[in-house]
Regions:
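Alpha-helical scaffold segments
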Residues: 1-170
Length: 170
């Protein structure tokens, strides 16, 4: 059943107008000041640290996100913020899910699965890597795609009470 869900899952339909708005080539870094071009935002994302890096965490453009993810000063906490951001551009979330450094972090994977903008096929691939306690939370979460919730429900049921107690440290 689970294999069939993964093979037949398709990415959620996103509001095209919202994605177009988020992918504008120019956008202000803060609520004030002139809009920065995509090139300027990408250049700022390469800098080691600073206020601009914190502001860029809210930039949904996949090109900016890709550069941010490679920034050695970026912390897991900041990547979790990127993964949990809503609304989000699905392509940017895919970059987080596939990044060699960040895709192994349980907190990042959890944030991606709980983000309804994460493409279904990506969320299904990640949900099996989470804990039984997370599976129960995902199964009950509103706003997530039905295949993701069903997968978590099935995994949670198969885990049984003993494995769930182990996962939560009881």
């Amino acid at each position: 059943v689970l294999r069939g869900m993964i093979l037949n899952a398709s990415p959620p339909t996103a509001d095209a107008a919202e994605i177009d708005r988020q992918l504008r080539p120019e956008r202000p870094l803060r609520n004030r000041g002139r809009p920065l071009t995509l090139g300027e935002r990408k250049a700022l994302a390469r800098r080691p640290r600073g206020d601009a890096l914190t502001e860029l965490l809210r930039d949904p453009h996949p090109d900016v996100v890709a550069i941010l993810l490679d920034n050695p000063q970026l912390t897991e906490r900041e990547v979790v913020r990127v993964a949990a951001m809503r609304p989000a551009v699905p392509a940017a979330l895919v970059l987080v899910a596939e990044h060699r450094r960040w895709s192994t972090r349980p907190g990042v994977r959890r944030a991606l699965v709980f983000n309804p903008h994460t493409p279904v096929h990506v969320a299904l691939r990640l949900v099996v890597t989470l804990s039984p306690a997370d599976w129960g939370d995902i199964a009950e979460a509103h706003g997530l795609a039905d295949p993701v919730r069903a997968s978590a429900r099935e995994l949670h049921a198969r885990a049984g009470p003993h494995r769930i107690r182990q996962a939560v440290g009881l």
